[in-house]
Design a protein with these regions (language model features):
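Cysteine/selenocysteine-centered motifs that mediate thiol-based redox chemistry or coordinate metal-sulfur cofactors
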Residues: 503-512
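Beta1-alpha1 glycine-rich phosphate/pyrophosphate-binding loop at the start
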Residues: 116-190, 228, 275-299, 491
């Protein structure tokens, strides 16, 4: 059905406008005098694209910074893995008209595999990087065998929701699983559940825990991380949990049904997200960590203290500067003993001490001190072998220093770049890293990668949190964090992509 939307002069160049047509939300734009209409809702989590930023013909979602072509609807940056629907637009007698329904809204970018191709592409790890790599191989026209190996017997899913929403019993809107079973069947992506115990780059073979082997023409190593254990007496008691998988989250939720008092060990992103989610469930929550300020190493003391105050206002109690020396209880946890001799009562303990790269099977490949692996800008580890996601130390945008970044969107970007290079393309990874963290339905966005900094410049208020934080080293902004600044942080991705040497005042003015 064709809809009269507006007069031709009513939509200014470069403006994003959302309209509802036939029950569908449509995003209308005008670029170089040409009108375009695509879906107005981000397929990742339902973000309102009209509140995003338009840059070089691409709209960046204000929520999680997925990006789409406004001309074709193509998803050009994750975390979205699906394109937007695209609608025909015409201008008749000075009126802009959009047709919704009655025709295919877009051409599926993944054609069915055709032709004879005997090559086998193997992906170890079915998380963000692995799932996107498998999809990209088919999108790029590869017609051979694609094998996606994971340790969990379920479809690849959005791991970010576990600490942010699953523990609270709420839903955040993220699409999970990433694709349904029909997708993998239709595009002949073989899903194997198993544990890889060895990889031989010279012979190009994988060995599984059951002794089976699989040869490959090119392989991607994307196993992600494994939780760092709590090595104290009593850490194996019932009611003590780590959080990495959906099964872990389900076990925590099951324990929470019968718990009243929770101790979270660790004040990093996962620990604080878990604390917030369990507090939203109505439990009494205490957080124990050796550092004096939450997230201080990642965000600095000022922003870290803002997170502490945010959680304290919700009733979370912090025990900082403390080491856990034992978990107390008989068969089931009853308390957490601290280094000062005190004991915190607990019916449930969640351990969030970070993760280490899950690279134990790479005995024939050189590994870093932190168990990661060094890759080049194409994410190549060796001939025919690539690495992506948490395990890959890649040349960071700007200075080229090899850096591991343990964040979902970066892993998805890695998966796409690695897959294209597995097929013989020459694509470098030079994106600006981005991640988000959510606490009590409030989100902090972080663009760039500071590592270390000389100073942090705060624009806004820390308590209550509503700010931009600029991380400055050698008089150049290395990263920007924003709390409650959705649109500005979407713009920051483009600005830091275009220019790598921003002085803080110039970037602050550019963000408005």
């Amino acid at each position: 059905m064709e809809h009269d939307v507006c007069a031709e002069h009513e939509l200014a160049e470069g403006v994003l406008r959302a309209v509802e047509l036939n029950g569908r939300k449509v995003l209308l734009t005008r670029l170089d005098g040409v009108y375009h209409a695509v879906g107005a809702t981000c397929p990742h989590a339902g973000g309102p694209l009209a509140e995003g930023v338009l840059r070089d013909g691409v709209v960046i979602c204000p929520w999680h910074k997925a990006a789409f072509s406004v001309a074709s609807g193509e998803a050009v940056e994750p975390p979205a893995v699906d394109d937007l629907p695209c609608f025909p637009v015409s201008v008749v007698d000075g009126r802009v008209r959009v047709t919704v329904g009655g025709q295919p809204e877009r051409v599926d970018p993944i054609g069915p595999p055709e032709g004879e191709d005997t090559r086998c592409m193997v992906i170890v790890g079915a998380g963000a990087a692995g799932a996107v790599a498998a999809q990209t191989l088919r999108e790029a026209g590869f017609a051979g065998r694609v094998v996606l190996i994971g340790r969990e017997d379920q479809l690849p899913y959005d791991r970010t929701v576990l600490s942010k929403y699953t523990l609270s019993g709420q839903q955040g809107g993220e699409k999970t699983p990433l694709q349904d079973a029909g997708f993998y069947a239709r595009y002949r992506i073989e899903r194997l559940t198993g544990e890889v115990t060895a990889l031989d780059p010279a012979l190009r073979t994988l060995t599984f825990a059951d002794g089976g082997q699989l040869g490959y023409d090119a392989a991607l190593i994307a196993p992600g991380g494994q939780p760092r254990p709590l090595n104290v007496p009593g850490s194996d008691l019932r009611g003590v949990h780590m959080l990495r998988t959906a099964a872990d989250a389900d076990a925590i939720v099951a324990s929470a049904e019968h718990a009243r008092r929770v101790v979270v060990i660790g004040a990093g992103y996962i620990g604080l997200e878990a604390a917030g989610s369990l507090r939203e469930r109505g439990l009494e929550v205490a957080v124990v960590a050796p550092q004096r300020t939450p997230l201080e190493r990642a965000l600095g003391p000022e922003v870290g203290h803002a997170f502490r105050r945010l959680h304290e206002r919700q009733g979370v109690v912090f025990h900082l500067g403390q080491e856990v020396v034992a978990i107390e209880g008989d068969a089931t946890v009853t308390g957490v003993r601290l280094g000062d001799g005190s004991t915190l009562p607990a019916d449930l303990v969640v351990v969030g001490l970070g993760v280490a790269p899950a690279t134990g099977f790479l005995r024939s490949v050189a590994r870093r001190e932190d168990a990661g692996v060094d890759v080049d800008a194409r994410l190549r580890l060796a001939d025919g072998l690539y690495a992506a996601g948490d395990v890959a130390a890649f040349p960071l945008y700007g200075d080229g220093a090899r850096t591991r970044v343990e964040h979902w969107r970066v892993a998805e970007q890695h998966g796409r770049v690695a897959a294209l290079n597995m097929l013989g393309h020459d694509v470098g990874y030079d994106a600006v890293p981005y991640f988000w963290t959510i606490h009590y339905k409030k989100r902090l966005d972080y663009v760039g990668h500071a590592g270390t900094w000389d100073r942090v410049v705060i624009d806004g208020t820390l308590d209550p949190p509503d700010f931009l934080a600029f991380y400055v080293r050698d008089e150049t902004v290395r990263a920007v964090a924003g709390f409650g600044r959705d649109t500005q942080m979407a713009a920051a991705i483009g600005l830091l992509t275009d220019r790598r040497d921003w002085p803080v005042e110039a970037l602050r003015q550019a963000l408005g």
